[in-house]
Amino acid sequence: MPTRPCASRRTVLRGAAAAPVAGLGLAACAAPDGSAAAAPTAPVELGEETEVAKGGAQLYRDHNVVVSRDQDGTLKAYSTICTHAGCPINKLEGTTLICPCHGSRFDAVTGKVVQAPATEQLTELSVKAANGRIVAGPAD
C-alpha cells in the first residue's frame, strides 16, 4: 500500500495562517447581529427629499435601503440586502450597487442584476416624499 508523503512544516504553517483570514472574509459578509432585515418592516424616514437628484440614487446603509429618482422625478426604493447570499450592500457607485461579499452588482434605479453571481433582482419597497422627507417601507 503506498504511503502518503508527510506535509512539510511550511505547508502546515501556511494552512494555519490562512484559516483566520478566511474566517474574516466570512465575518465581513455577515450583518452585525448575524441577520439583516431584507426590508424595513414599518415605514422609516430616510432623509431629505433633496438628497436624491433626478437620475441619481442615495444609499441609506443604516436601513439597508437605496432610493433612486428617475428623470421624471419618480422615486423608487429597494432593499440593499444582496439576493445572492444575504450580505448588506454598502457601496454605491453612480447608480450601481456593489455587494462586498461576492461582487454582485445591481442597478439602483431598477433593482435588476447587472453582474452575477446574484440572479434575482432586489426587493422593491414602497417609497414616498412626505413633508420634504423620504419615507420607505414594506411593499404595498
Placement of each model-derived feature along the sequence:
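Functionally engaged cysteine thiol sites
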Residues: C6, C87, C101
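Short cysteine/histidine-rich metal-coordination sites, predominantly Zn2+-binding motifs
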Residues: T96-G103, V113-L122
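Alpha-helical protein-protein interaction elements
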Residues: A16-V21, V52, I98, V114
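N-terminal secretory signal peptides and thylakoid transit peptides that target proteins
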Residues: M1-G25
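N-terminal pre-ligand scaffold of iron-sulfur
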Residues: P2, V21, G25, C29-G94, ...
